[in-house]
């Protein structure tokens, strides 16, 4: 009887915890964050970029694959406008250049964001700190990367917000600093434009309550430790996507596009850098998310 009872309790506790997380996200997530049309509470992503492309085809052949799982867990304050948000994730890159052995690089990260609104003001601020373990084999010897961002938002109208800020991270190749500029724009009932450049920018169009399509740009700069130093990826992706809602919250995302100005480099910090000079290729992305939309579908 005991062996039967324990698994039932564990399954029930897991379901209750999941429902609590969803309830907190739906009911209490800060209003200032709702300028973006949705929040992905849990996301699974897989991207495959084969050695086939239309741009820069005369460089070294390369294949890339990517997998990640992540979540967003807000802890709101009493005013329901301010919050601390925990966004832990795991990711892995696989890369193979020409006929060399395939290499894998991993990341375990914990971004923590503090969202603060100012009473009777159109201004708000987001402060972010992120700790990451990036390596070809994560262990006790893996060096921790620490970085963060400051993002100031100005709500010009009910449907339009501008954002400015700066991002800093202690990458394995050195200190990486990047200015930020963003927008959250509800163009009309069917169209949205949102993102923070140079990281990402998304255009979204609603067909009906089950289907949305649009265009995406994202830029990725990360470094991972290895036996001799570091492996660095600079990946820029421009693509088209389709979101299919199976019900109110479960979403399948399909995206296809092309990389632009892709670079894979290795090196030793402040000493040497080697550029693999790889091709830009097509990419195909599949994602499954539990999504909360802040506007009526």
Placement of each model-derived feature along the sequence:
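Short glycine/proline- and aromatic-enriched beta-strand/turn motifs that initiate or cap beta-hairpins
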Residues: 35-96
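Transmembrane beta-barrel strands of outer-membrane/channel proteins
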Residues: 42-50, 86-92, 127-131, 164-168, ...
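Sequence/structural signature of outer-membrane beta-barrel proteins
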Residues: 49-55, 91-99, 117, 130-138, ...
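Residues that define the transmembrane beta-barrel architecture of outer-membrane proteins
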Residues: 61-67, 102-108, 140-146, 175-179, ...
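Membrane-embedded beta-strands of outer-membrane beta-barrel proteins
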Residues: 67-73, 108-114, 148-150, 181, ...
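Residue-level signature of outer-membrane beta-barrel architecture
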Residues: 73-75, 116-118, 154, 185, ...
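Repeated loop/turn-to-beta-strand initiation elements of outer-membrane beta-barrel proteins
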Residues: 77-84, 120-125, 158-164, 190-193, ...
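Outer-membrane beta-barrel "beta-signal"
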Residues: 180-186, 242, 277-297
């Amino acid at each position: 009887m005991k062996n039967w009872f324990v698994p039932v309790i564990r399954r029930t506790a897991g379901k209750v915890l999941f429902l609590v997380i969803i309830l907190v996200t739906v009911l209490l997530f800060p209003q200032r964050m709702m300028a973006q049309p949705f929040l992905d509470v849990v996301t699974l992503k897989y991207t495959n970029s084969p050695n086939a492309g239309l741009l820069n085809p005369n460089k070294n052949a390369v294949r890339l694959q990517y997998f990640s799982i992540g979540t967003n867990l807000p802890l709101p304050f009493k005013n329901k406008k301010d919050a601390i948000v925990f966004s832990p994730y795991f990711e892995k890159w696989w890369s193979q250049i020409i006929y060399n052995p395939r290499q894998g690089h991993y990341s375990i990260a914990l971004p923590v964001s503090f969202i603060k609104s100012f009473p009777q003001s159109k201004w708000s601020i987001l402060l972010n700190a992120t700790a990451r373990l990036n390596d070809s084999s994560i262990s006790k010897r893996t060096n921790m990367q620490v970085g963060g961002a400051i993002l100031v938002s100005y709500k010009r109208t009910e449907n339009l917000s501008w954002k400015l800020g700066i991002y800093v991270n202690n990458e394995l190749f050195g200190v990486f600093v990047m200015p930020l500029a963003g927008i959250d724009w509800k163009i009309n009932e069917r169209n949205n434009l949102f993102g923070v450049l140079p990281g990402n920018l998304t255009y979204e169009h609603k067909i009906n309550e089950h289907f949305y399509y649009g265009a995406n740009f994202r830029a990725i700069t990360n470094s991972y430790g290895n036996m001799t130093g570091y492996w660095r990826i600079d990946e820029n992706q421009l693509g088209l996507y389709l979101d299919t809602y199976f019900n109110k919250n479960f979403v399948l995302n399909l995206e296809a596009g092309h990389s632009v100005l892709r670079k894979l480099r290795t090196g030793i910090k402040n000493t040497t850098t080697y550029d693999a000079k790889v091709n830009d290729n097509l990419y195909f992305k599949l994602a499954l998310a539990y999504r909360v939309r802040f506007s009526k579908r």
